[in-house]
Amino acid sequence: MMDDFPDARPLSGTVALVAGATRGAGRGIAVELGAAGATVYVTGRTTRERRSEYDRPETIEETAALVSEAGGHGIAVPTDHLEPTQVEALVARIAREQDGLDVLVNDIWGGEKLVEWNVPIWEHSLDKGLRLLRLAIDTHLITNHYALPLLIRKPGGLVVEMTDGTARYNDTHYRLSAFYDMAKTSVTRLAWALSHEVAPHGGTAVALTPGWMRSEMMLEHYDVTEATWRDATTREPHFVISETPRFVGRAVAALAADPDRARWNGQSLSSGGLAADYGFTDVDGSRPDCFRYLVEVQEAGRPADATGYR
């Protein structure tokens, strides 16, 4: 699974927390950290006993099992990251059970069903918009508040703030909702701010975005499976540039395994950009460069063709 790394278990002995790992990018990241040998704490609100407001079947127990099957050690801890006492208890448990925390991935989101796309702010549901911002921003702030003291106990810690879109892309593109736009650009700025706070302790903080990701929800949207995803290109031809959640997972694993990762401190990164630098691939052996494709092909009005972009 980690053929892209000379050392099949470069993260053996590494302790990671993937906050928001029930599905999507968080699950892909947790699995790839596990494939690299890490112990991975995975959190979320949906368990075998209880579903979150998403009302979806994926659970954190499933994610933890996938981490262990990949070669790591997955530990599921039900956590609502809007509840400070729950996050504090989570970090206290990691501190008791492990010798510190090496990697923190903040992938908490939960706003898909709250966004009203292409609706101006004065028409958008205020309750949904504010709830979206709490889920997208407050959760990250709360988690950093409690987890970073453990992470900075020793040098070399890595913080990855997951978002949608690189800073360069988002600076020139309206993300179809004021609430969504603010949520995703705020997380990028948070990573930049954190980079200044963890650097004196030998830490690194970055913002990271996947490309057009074939998450569980996206596959369902197009009524396809991972095995048949190309069928979706009949409805949306530019879906040809899409990638699996494991691709951005390999990006995080590559960062965590890089002893020189501090060179990225404060930067806004993408799965495709890091693949070009580190040489890892998606599960099909390709290297999709989504944001370059979006600008140079889709937005340029060219026919859908991923040749040269994956």
PLM segments and residue spans:
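Active-site loop of short-chain dehydrogenase/reductase
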Residues: 14, 72-73, 100-101, 151-165, ...
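Structural signature of the Rossmann-like NAD(P)-dependent dehydrogenase/reductase core
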Residues: 18-19, 106-109, 136, 157-167, ...
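A short helix-coil junction within the Rossmann-fold of NAD(P)-dependent oxidoreductases
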Residues: 36, 97-98, 111-116, 146-155, ...
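Amphipathic alpha-helical dimer-interface segment in Rossmann-like NAD(P)H-dependent oxidoreductases
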Residues: 131-153, 167, 195-196, 200
